[in-house]
Amino acid sequence: VGYQPGRAGLSIAEFWRPQLSDYRTFVGLDVHARTIVGSALDATTGEVLRHRFGCDLSEVVAWTRSLPGPQIATYEAGPTGFGLYRRLLESGTACVVAAPSKLQRPSGDRVRTDARDAFHLMRLLHLDEITAVTVPSVEEETARDLVRSREDTRQDLMGVRHRLSRLLLRHGFVYDDGAAWTQKHDRCLREHRGGDLAFMTAFDANDETVVQAVARRDRLDKAITAMAEDSPFTPMVNRLGCLRGISTLTGFALAVEITDWHRFTGSTIGAYLALVPSEYSSGQSRQLGGITKTGNTHARRLLVEAAWHHRRDYRPSPSSVLQARWDKAPVAAQLRGQAGNERLHHQWVAFTARKKRPVVANVASPASWRAGAGPSR
């Protein structure tokens, strides 16, 4: 048995260094939508082979299997997904998907081609300098696609609502009678639909888009809620729901984005979510900057939004909504969630006493969330 995938953020040396000598051929693949370039090193003879393919993954798999074995291949994670990874594993070729942000590149290298990129990946693989990403299962990947479709719809809805508001603002309408985008707000908007034909046509176009986006969002919400209640992700969603600010939709999204929480510690989860401060230190100088923002942006946004709920006063007795979520979780998770809610609120109190800006305090709160309030079995 060679490389065993499944954990993220660690060099493949931590998985298969004892079996490194078992592999004879190291393959680097530069994968694009329509072309794939391969570079292979025979570690026994030192021979380097190169090949260019179209978009047919079967050709890549056949070429890789024709090389002296055993073989191990790598390519960068990206928009092409993990189909090639799965095909290679099925054919008997070990494969690791590299984290693009962790690839080492010479600062003086100003020539980038597909062939050079494939050779670079091959070389890093042979030198054991690849940082692997966690490859989700097919079920996890499809659930993640569902969640991200909902996120795309949310952004579309927010954008078209802004466009409709700006259209009305340019014609002198400002709504200041309560919360926006309620039934009352909708009735008020339609009362200001009048005007010339061009304005009414523009209004109707944006209004129809709003209605369609709301319907699409609600349809996705129902699908996510149903999946959260009866799927392999249900236990994790129920445990996450013990925290304030983690609804069913948020809990399901976090469950499918992070998948295996136990691969992280309290310190590494912050780095994965890019909630740790950037640093520029040298010698006696130490300078900290804003958060790195290099990790999973989807999970980070969810946690930052959920952290705002801990700013409110903490009550030992949960609300009816939170109690309903607690009833679905194990007792250990309930106790862990209660302790986490209290600790996160006390963090907010401490930040307020130090006169920290709310936006800064809110980002600092989820950075240590996993350490004291992560899901419990």
Spans of features found by a protein language model:
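A detector of single, family-specific signature residues
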Residues: 1-377
